[in-house]
From Swiss-Prot:
Lineage: Bacteria, Pseudomonadati, Pseudomonadota, Gammaproteobacteria, Enterobacterales
Gene Ontology molecular functions: hydrolase activity, acting on carbon-nitrogen (but not peptide) bonds, in linear amidines; N4-acetylcytidine amidohydrolase activity
EC number(s) per entry: 3.5.1.135
NCBIfam families: PRK04980.1
Keyword terms: Hydrolase
PANTHER family: UCP029143 FAMILY PROTEIN (PTHR38088:SF2)
Described purpose of this protein according to its UniProt entry: Catalyzes the hydrolysis of N(4)-acetylcytidine (ac4C).
Official protein name in the record: N(4)-acetylcytidine amidohydrolase
Recorded family membership: Belongs to the N(4)-acetylcytidine amidohydrolase family.
Catalytic residues as annotated in Swiss-Prot or TrEMBL: 21 (proton acceptor), 24 (nucleophile), 74 (proton donor)
Gene designation per UniProt: yqfB
Amino acid sequence: MQPNDITFFQRFQNDILAGRKTITIRDASESHFKAGDVLRVGRFEDDGYFCTIEVTGTSTVTLDTLNEKHAQQENMSLDELKRVIAEIYPNQTQFYVIDFKCLR
C-alpha cells in the first residue's frame, strides 16, 4: 500500500470531500509542500486513505493574522479556527497555509 503524504483529523474528511474545506494550516514540519504537488490524503486516526488533493498555493500566517477568509476556507468560524489551531499547535504562532483542491 502506498503511504499517505498528509493526514487530516477524521472530522474534516466530509468537508474536504465536499469542497467546503480548501486550506489547511500547518506548522513548520509541513512547510515543504508547494503549488502543483499532488498528495495522497489519509485520516490522522487510522492513516486510512480517503482522497487525493492538489496544492494550489502556499503562504504564511500568524495566529494574530488569521482572518474571516481563512475561517471560511476552513469551513468554521474565526473563533473556532483560532481555538482549533491553538489546541493542535500550543505555544506556536507562525503557521503555513496550504491551499488545495480535492481531486478525489
